[in-house]
């Protein structure tokens, strides 16, 4: 899911840097606004960031016999939307690129775009579409699953665009096989973990979720406030 | 803990263990349990053999051991923050009920 250092031609690296940069800057503005308007939600920001830190450090075996790790972006996407999640993802990706040589600095833009922007955007959309139609725990689970899948599909598209050999469709299918298939069971795992943590926040601090406009204020009584 | 949560945790455990059981006895030398990132890198070299990565990481963990250390550190930072949040709020919650 990370594109390795140096593996994107300079032109594509620049394009993804530009696109991600715009979203991350917008996300920083949104983040500052959120902290100013609702300082009490700060702990949930730390929580969403920490969740990404943990999940993206767990290299899990998948039924295809290869290993990959979840992104943890679904929780942030559901709570704060894709722009703020992109800022959180940037921190995680910088940590991994600089200290672990996992991902890279030249490919940072592309990796932010897939893991921090497209995945969370898809998760956010799924959450908005299904909210109120299902029990909210399962809505969150599905949002996280689709955020994870969205990330891998995006990475495959990015690689197929940079290496359309012999043609875009074939390359997409090949890269898709490497990533997306490995990721199907891992995404379900990520969804379940996200649902578990969501339920625990709902139990202890429903007021914070109500502040973010995610649940009805009426349901927010009885937490630890 | 609700029944739903027990099922969710079981699901996570089963999904993690299944591949280890399915490919039991096979390892990296047989091409199993390598990273998907590396596999994509290999695929690029395969379809575009003349491609030279044009940038190298500034610094790489000198060994697999050091890499595990840093990955564990990453997880620990995350776990500390989450543990603090839930611990703090759980104590307050128990206090009120």
UniProtKB/Swiss-Prot annotation, chain B:
Keywords: Cell membrane, Cobalamin biosynthesis, Cobalt, Cobalt transport, Ion transport, Membrane, Transmembrane, Transmembrane helix, Transport. GO terms for cellular component: plasma membrane. The keyword Nucleotide-binding does not apply. GO terms for biological process: cobalamin biosynthetic process. It is a multi-pass membrane protein. Its main location: membrane. One of its GO terms (molecular function) is cobalt ion transmembrane transporter activity. The keyword Nucleotide-binding does not apply. The chain crosses the membrane at residues 6-26, 68-88. Coiled coil: none annotated. Pathway: Cofactor biosynthesis; adenosylcobalamin biosynthesis. It comes from the Archaea. Pfam families: CbiN. It is found in: Cell membrane. Forms an energy-coupling factor (ECF) transporter complex composed of an ATP-binding protein (A component, CbiO), a transmembrane protein (T component, CbiQ) and 2 possible substrate-capture proteins (S components, CbiM and CbiN) of unknown stoichimetry. Belongs to the CbiN family. Part of the energy-coupling factor (ECF) transporter complex CbiMNOQ involved in cobalt import. This is Cobalt transport protein CbiN. It comes from Methanococcus maripaludis (strain C7 / ATCC BAA-1331). The lineage of its organism: Archaea, Methanobacteriati, Methanobacteriota, Methanomada group, Methanococci.
């Amino acid at each position: 899911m990370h594109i390795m250092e140096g593996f994107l031609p300079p032109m594509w690296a620049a394009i993804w840097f530009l696109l991600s940069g715009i979203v991350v800057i917008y996300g920083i503005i949104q983040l500052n606004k959120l902290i100013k308007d609702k300082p009490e939600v700060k702990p949930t920001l730390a929580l969403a960031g920490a969740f990404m830190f943990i999940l993206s450090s767990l290299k899990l075996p998948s039924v295809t016999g290869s290993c990959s790790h979840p992104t943890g972006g679904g929780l942030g996407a559901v709570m704060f939307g894709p722009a703020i999640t992109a800022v959180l993802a940037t921190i995680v990706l910088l940590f991994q690129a600089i200290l672990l040589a996992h991902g890279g600095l030249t490919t940072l833009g592309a990796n932010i775009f897939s893991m921090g922007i497209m995945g969370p955007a898809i998760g956010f959309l799924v959450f908005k579409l299904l909210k109120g139609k299902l029990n909210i725990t399962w809505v969150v689970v599905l949002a996280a699953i689709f955020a994870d899948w969205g990330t891998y599909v995006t990475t495959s598209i990015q690689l197929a665009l940079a290496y359309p050999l012999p043609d875009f469709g074939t390359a997409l299918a090949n890269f898709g096989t490497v990533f997306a298939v490995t990721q199907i069971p891992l995404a379900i795992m990520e969804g379940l973990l996200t649902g578990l943590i969501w339920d625990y926040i709902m139990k202890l601090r429903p007021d914070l979720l109500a502040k973010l406009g995610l649940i009805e204020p009426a349901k927010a009584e009885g937490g630890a406030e | 803990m609700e029944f739903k949560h027990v099922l969710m945790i079981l699901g996570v455990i089963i999904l993690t263990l299944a591949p280890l059981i399915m490919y039991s006895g096979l390892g990296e030398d047989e091409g199993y349990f390598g990273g998907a990132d590396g596999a994509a890198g290999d695929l690029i070299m395969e379809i575009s053999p003349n491609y030279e990565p044009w940038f190298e990481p500034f610094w790489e963990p000198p060994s697999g051991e050091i890499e595990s250390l840093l990955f564990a550190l990453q997880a620990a930072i995350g776990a500390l923050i989450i543990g603090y949040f839930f611990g703090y709020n759980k104590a307050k919650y128990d206090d009120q009920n």
